[in-house]
Amino acid sequence: MTPQTSSTGNAPKGNTQVAYPIPKPIIWLGRLLQFFSKDLAAAYSRFFFMRPMRHKMKPAESRWKQEAEQQFIEVPSIGKTISVYRWGPKDAPKVLIAHGWSGRGTQFIDLSRKLLDAGYQVYAFDAPAHGQSGTKSTLMLEFIESIREMDRRFGPFEAIVGHSMGGIAALNAVGRFGLRPKRLVTVGIPDSIKKIFYQFAEIMGLKPVIAKKNIDYLAKVYGTDIDHLAGSYNAALTDIPVLVIHDKKDKEVPYTEAEAIVRNLKNGKLLLTEGFGHRRILRNPEVIEQIVHYIRTGKLLNEDHGTQE
């Protein structure tokens, strides 16, 4: 099927947010280790690869968190506990929001409020090693399992909205594991998971062989070929409607990865923005309006007005 594509936004030009920097002493030690033991260098880099950054919560997010009904649930498949948040009337249709790496379930204030205004209740969670969910390290697998457990406990969901790691995890949950929300919306998600390992090794100043060792190690942990985590692979297994949103100025994940994912979707739409980057896109009113409209109708706003590109 030919994906349907649209575009929105003319944000001011400027630098978008980039990946969180790694302190130079950590990089220097990793570079040194690889000359003595590639296995040790791989384990060393993996230690940091699996540890998200934690950030202080701003007052607006803190107030939004206080408005939530909060509970902690166990995810038996990974043996960890996650913090769950809920807003809105309990008899309303449900939307699940999945945050990205180093994010929190309480960060989607504007989107959540618009969903509440549209008559939905909103569920979100802090993935392992994020927010209030405890532990210090995590993997994409644990994002996937957290989403599956949310569906088992609180589903079915009208839609799942996932940003970055949360989005690719949601696509895996739908594609490989058969979750059936009515619709899925992804924002700024990667296609190739292998590429992330090589990019991280490059940031650390490590040789590609170190990335390969980590890929092989984590393939054993996941119990699957890492290629089977890819966005395009799971897109081919997905038959529910999916809206893929990506910014052309995203410096962390190039928008060409979104295009690759959409090409494999049976029922996919691509919405490209320009100038919002990897994170500010989540606060853009036009994008939020498109997400809510898509969840309600399965269409983009410009489709209703006959201006689809």
Language-model regions: role of each:
Residues 237-239, 244-246, 250:
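Short beta-strand/loop motif that positions the catalytic acidic residue
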Residues 105, 112-134:
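Conserved alpha/beta-hydrolase
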Residues 175-224:
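Hydrolase active-site cap/lid region
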Residues 276-288:
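Catalytic histidine-centered segment of alpha/beta-hydrolase-like enzymes
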Residues 137-158:
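Alpha/beta-hydrolase active-site loop
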Residues 162, 166-170:
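Gly/Ala-rich beta-loop-alpha elbow adjacent to hydrolase catalytic centers
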Residues 18-74:
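An N-terminal hydrophobic leader/cap segment in hydrolases
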Residues 111, 231, 240, 254-261:
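Short alpha-helix in the alpha/beta-hydrolase fold that links the catalytic acid
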